[in-house]
């Protein structure tokens, strides 16, 4: 688990609209990388290109390369379903399957991929995934109850458990704490710090303090105006981005002068 991501000259389009322009960067394994920038700058769109989730929108396509340990996710014959198994996604709002039990939520991805699994192996996978998401001790006595009955923070950790149950190499998180209270946010941030020991993690956040707390490296995106493509302005170690950025636009954003 945990893979290196290399992006070369990536451009993202929705039909004729150029959404993200000419991004190149490398994300090292077992690290947390934060994408920051104003609304509409393309950071979430770019995040979705890392597991081809943007393709659910009709007319979406990319030019350029996304390599995971040297393998191009956009190569001829590459199955997007297999890509999304390798590169998991946690969304902005917790989205457990409301009619499924906690246990079945964890196993949902495994069953979707048609993996046959014994009850013993399933039990072990459920426990291991919930432990990996720091949720086991809170739910071990109610695994057969609906996941929708959990608190917001617990639901988000359940979604993380569901994501890691299929053994991905990379975890993408699109503003995973934006709908959570401060205590639940802290629990997710602590979990991210633990998960990076096993996964490559990329997180989109509007919270500058969160980016500075959880990430090793930070990419700042911005946009010149309505209808213009988002651009990567600066990518560096997080402490440099927040203390001594090279671009004036980065300094203006992280210091709160705009954005």
Curated annotation (Swiss-Prot):
Pfam families for the chain: ABC_tran
Any one GO CC term of the record: plasma membrane
Binding locations of ATP: 37-44
Keywords tagged on the record: ATP-binding, Cell membrane, Membrane, Nucleotide-binding, Phosphate transport, Translocase, Transport
Membrane topology: Peripheral membrane protein
SUPFAM superfamilies cross-referenced by the UniProt entry: P-loop containing nucleoside triphosphate hydrolases
Molecular function per GO: ATP binding; ATP hydrolysis activity; ATPase-coupled phosphate ion transmembrane transporter activity
Listed EC numbers: 7.3.2.1
Residues annotated as domain ABC transporter: 5-248
Catalyzed chemical reaction(s): phosphate(out) + ATP + H2O = ADP + 2 phosphate(in) + H(+)
Subcellular compartments: Cell membrane
Family as reported in the entry's similarity comment: Belongs to the ABC transporter superfamily. Phosphate importer (TC 3.A.1.7) family.
Summary of the function given for this chain in its UniProt record: Part of the ABC transporter complex PstSACB involved in phosphate import. Responsible for energy coupling to the transport system.
Protein name (Swiss-Prot/TrEMBL): Phosphate import ATP-binding protein PstB
The species this protein was found in: Leifsonia xyli subsp. xyli (strain CTCB07)
């Amino acid at each position: 688990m945990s893979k290196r991501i290399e992006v070369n000259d990536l451009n993202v389009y929705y039909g004729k609209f150029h959404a993200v322009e000419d991004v190149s960067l490398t994300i090292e394994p077992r690290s947390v990388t934060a994408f920051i920038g104003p609304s509409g700058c393309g950071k979430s769109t770019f995040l979705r290109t890392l597991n081809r989730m943007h393709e659910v929108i009709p007319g979406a396509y990319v030019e350029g390369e996304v390599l995971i340990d040297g393998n191009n996710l956009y190569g001829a014959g590459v199955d997007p379903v297999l890509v999304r198994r390798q590169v998991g996604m946690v969304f902005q709002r917790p989205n457990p399957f409301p009619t499924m039990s906690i246990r079945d939520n964890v196993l949902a991805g495994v069953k979707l991929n048609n993996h046959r699994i014994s009850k013993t192996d399933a039990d072990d996978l459920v426990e291991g995934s919930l432990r990996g998401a720091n949720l086991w001790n809170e739910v071990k006595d109610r695994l057969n109850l609906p996941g929708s009955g959990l608190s917001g923070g617990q639901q988000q950790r359940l979604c993380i458990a569901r994501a890691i149950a299929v053994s991905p190499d990379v975890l993408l998180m699109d503003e995973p704490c934006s709908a959570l209270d401060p205590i639940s946010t802290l629990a997710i941030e602590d979990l991210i710090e633990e998960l990076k020991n096993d996964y490559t993690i990329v997180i989109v956040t509007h919270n500058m303090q969160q980016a500075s707390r959880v990430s090793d490296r930070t990419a700042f995106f911005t946009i010149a105006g309505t209808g213009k493509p988002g651009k990567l302005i600066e990518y560096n170690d997080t402490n440099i981005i927040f203390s001594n950025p090279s671009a004036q636009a980065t300094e203006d954003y992280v210091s709160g002068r705009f954005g």
